[in-house]
Amino acid sequence: MIASTSGDMCQMNVLGVIGSPRKNGNTEILVDEVLRGAKDAGSAIERIFLNELKIKPCQATCIQYCKTHGKCNIPDDMSPLYDKLYDSDAIVLGTPVYWWGPSAQLKVFIDRWYAFCHPAFAKKFKGKKLVLVSPFEDSDITTPEHLVGMLKRSAEYMKMDFSDKLLVTAKEKGAVARDTKTMKEAYDIGARLKN
């Protein structure tokens, strides 16, 4: 599902991407709270729930096409997302931690960013803000280190500003909604995106 609030040309565009397969879970709750903070601060927001889309994994067959067009030629639900990524000023990626990395839904989405590898397209991401929101079940706070490292390196490669991250231990579905401190932190991250 893709949902948005329309805004004027001067507004910051914030794209929220939910990579959890679970509806109404901790990832979705936190990304929505970041987006609420961004909207209340005057940003236009758009929200994508990846599990509702049909996005195929990279097939490594269209490398030249990707490098010359800045998007992939696989005909699936990723196609309209390229323009949304290009048009955003900030991207909020939400994913639970699965095996020390992102969910399959988010990984496939990010793998299709190969289309941005050519400098002509990568430069369009220079200065865009990237935020990671990641709830995880493990009580070991080092659990998301590899996920953070992956996204930090990706942001560096594309000259994006890895501006914030929210890493939260949350064992049961929806638990974060009762954690006022975490919800405030998520809201504040969204509100700060305009700065």
Language-model segments: residues:
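Short beta-strand elements in bilobed, periplasmic/extracellular small-molecule ligand-binding domains
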Residues: A44-F49, M160-V168
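Sparse recognition of residues in long alpha-helices and their boundaries
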Residues: S43, A122-F125, K171
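N-terminal beta1-alpha1-beta2 submodule of the flavodoxin-like/Rossmannoid cofactor-binding fold
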Residues: M1-F116, K173-V176, T180-N195
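Short, glycine-/small-residue-rich phosphate/pyrophosphate-handling segment
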Residues: A104-Q105, P119-D164
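A short, flexible beta-alpha/helix-coil linker loop
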Residues: F136-S139, T169-K173
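Short beta-strands and strand-loop turn motifs
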Residues: V17-I18, G94, L132-P135, L166-L167
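Intrinsically disordered, low-complexity segments used for protein-protein interactions
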Residues: Q64, G127, V168-K171
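Short, well-ordered helical secondary-structure segments
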Residues: Q59, R112, A120, E145, ...
